[in-house]
Amino acid sequence: MFNTAVKILYRSLIELTNHRLSSYLIKGFCESKISKPVIPLFSKHFRLNWDDVDGTAADYGSLSELFIRQINLERRPVSKEAHAVVSPVDGVVQTVGIINPNQTFTVKGKDYSFAELTGCKSADHQYNGGYFVVLYLSPRHYHRFHSPISCRYQKLAELGNRSYPVNQLGLKYGKDVLSKNYRFVYELNSGSRNVLMIPVGAMNINSIVQTNTRTELEIGEELGYFSFGSTVILVFEKDAFQPSAHLAEGQEVQVGELIGYEE
């Protein structure tokens, strides 16, 4: 009863604040020089790690510039192990699981539709029974996403037009946020296997930008960025991925870090 009441209140508050005007105003503020004085407060509140960044808070002209900051990728060595799959982002592992036979996957006790998430309507596809990994980027994390494998890739779909919070509260009390939010669906082909990589937008700023125009990517190569903290979902074919021993809910991971192996 209590959880139901909290869920209704949470969704109502989100709907009241999540519309085009508020998104426009927040985005405009973050991109303007007016937001520059907020950077030190933001950095302190979210405990940004400046050791990985060339420069200081004073070098950024706006919050938006800070969100999409570059980092020294020499501090993110890409795993050289054979058949390695690496983390595409700096973030936190929210869930590791397997796509269910009924075409759903479960995150934080909620069932999501694989078809709705990916736009794949066929019930007969190679991802049935495969692993999925959900990685959450908080506002403090580096906001760029990279390729988890060496591959050829294509963008299969651009879905959703609004976004809701993808943090712990959003997953617990929101309504199917991972399969409703604005998102891209990429298919990565390593030559023998396919992997789906799905960057999912976050509330208000709701922006995903692809920076790489090449059709082939090296493992760890940048593909794009978010304009605010968000989520990346990886989906593997059945019997095509073996998670590493440390890949567990709540684990912090970094770009280039080993998260498993292609099989």
UniProtKB/Swiss-Prot annotation:
Keywords per UniProt: Cell membrane, Decarboxylase, Lipid biosynthesis, Lipid metabolism, Lyase, Membrane, Phospholipid biosynthesis, Phospholipid metabolism, Pyruvate, Zymogen
Membrane topology type: Peripheral membrane protein
Phenotype caused by lack of the gene: Disruption mutant contains no phosphatidylethanolamine and accumulates phosphatidylserine, but it grows well without supplementation of divalent cations.
Location within or outside the cell: Cell membrane
Major localisation: membrane
InterPro entries: PS_Dcarbxylase (IPR003817), PSD-B (IPR033177), PSD_type1_pro (IPR033178)
Cofactor binding remark: Binds 1 pyruvoyl group covalently per subunit.
Entry EC no(s): 4.1.1.65
Residues that bear Pyruvic acid (Ser): 230
Keyword Cell membrane attached: yes
GO cellular component: plasma membrane
Example GO biological process: phosphatidylethanolamine biosynthetic process
Listed cofactors: pyruvate
Pathway: Phospholipid metabolism; phosphatidylethanolamine biosynthesis; phosphatidylethanolamine from CDP-diacylglycerol: step 2/2
Subunit structure: Heterodimer of a large membrane-associated beta subunit and a small pyruvoyl-containing alpha subunit.
Protein name, entry field: Phosphatidylserine decarboxylase proenzyme
Record organism: Bacillus subtilis (strain 168)
Source organism phylogeny: Bacteria, Bacillati, Bacillota, Bacilli, Bacillales
